Amino acid sequence: NKGLNPGMVVXLVVASFLLIFFVGNYALYXYAQKTLPPKKKKPVSKKKLKKEKLKQGVSAPGE
């Protein structure tokens, strides 16, 4: 028994990287929310949204 097998090590490394990545993103997001002034968006009607989507084709979600 030589301690952990390589598969476990790889999985642990990947898992820890993902964890760090998500925690880092969350921290940055919270930090940005505090420091940046909130952008005031004009309310867009649903008809306009539909027209914009039709014009652009199907745009990336979250834009």
Swiss-Prot record:
GO terms for biological process: regulation of DNA-templated transcription. A motif (Nuclear localization signal) lies at residues 37-42. GO terms for cellular component: nucleus. It comes from the Eukaryota. InterPro entries: S1FA_DNA-bd. It is found in: Nucleus. Residues 38-53 have a biased composition (Basic residues). Pfam families: S1FA (PF04689). Residues 38-63 are annotated as: Disordered. Its main location: nucleus. Keywords: DNA-binding, Nucleus, Repressor, Transcription, Transcription regulation. One of its GO terms (molecular function) is DNA binding. PANTHER family: DNA-BINDING PROTEIN S1FA1-RELATED, DNA-BINDING PROTEIN S1FA2. DNA-binding protein that specifically recognizes a negative element (S1F) within the RPS1 promoter. Belongs to the S1FA transcription factor family. This is DNA-binding protein S1FA. It comes from Zea mays (Maize). The gene is S1FA.
